[in-house]
Amino acid sequence: EDGYSDNSLITASCSVHISLKTYEKIAVTLGLDCNHEKILLNQEKINSKKFDRDGISRKRFSMDNYYPFLCGIGDDELISKTLSNFYNEGLGIKCVIEEPWVTFAESSEFIISLVKMNRKEDAKKILEEVMRFQDNRGIFPTGYQYKLDILWPDEFSTWTNAAVIIAADCVFGISQKRNVFLA
């Protein structure tokens, strides 16, 4: 009606949520007044139809299912359901529920979600599976299409490799620093 679509992205909203929570921690450290409780996400907001793009459910995309866990939103039953829907044993996390490919950025972000939701053993298992795809240079491909047994897409994206590093740090505490996703 006003020229704007009434759509919101769960992934973007969760990223903003994490940023606001981090800002609040910084503000407290600096002695500044800050309260974003009214605009922060919760399970009720996540279940809103505003996240169904143009009336089409986004539940088939793994990111739209696990990003709320990065914010600490959800419960063990919901994360188990997400794991059941998107986890491919021995390979990692599918990007899209009906497609035969896993991506290692999605796998890594889901690993972080599992650690955040106190499912560290599941996180460790999936990370070990992802590690099998590291090439002889120490680099991870973006994804793997398991029906065709090919790397797909045929690229080695920086964000994928960054996500694997962050996931490994969440699981093993390699940096020995506090992780913003786990705070």
What is the role of each PLM region?
Residues 1-39, 115, 153, 179:
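The feature captures the catalytic groove of carbohydrate-active enzymes
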Residues 1-8, 38-104, 125-183:
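Extended glycan-interaction surfaces of carbohydrate-active proteins
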Residues 23-24, 75, 117, 171:
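Generic hydrophobic alpha-helical segments
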Residues 26-29, 120, 133, 174:
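Alpha-solenoid helical repeat scaffolds
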Residues 34-35, 121-125:
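Alpha-helical positions within canonical tetratricopeptide repeat
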Residues 97-118:
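Internal helical hairpin/lid segments
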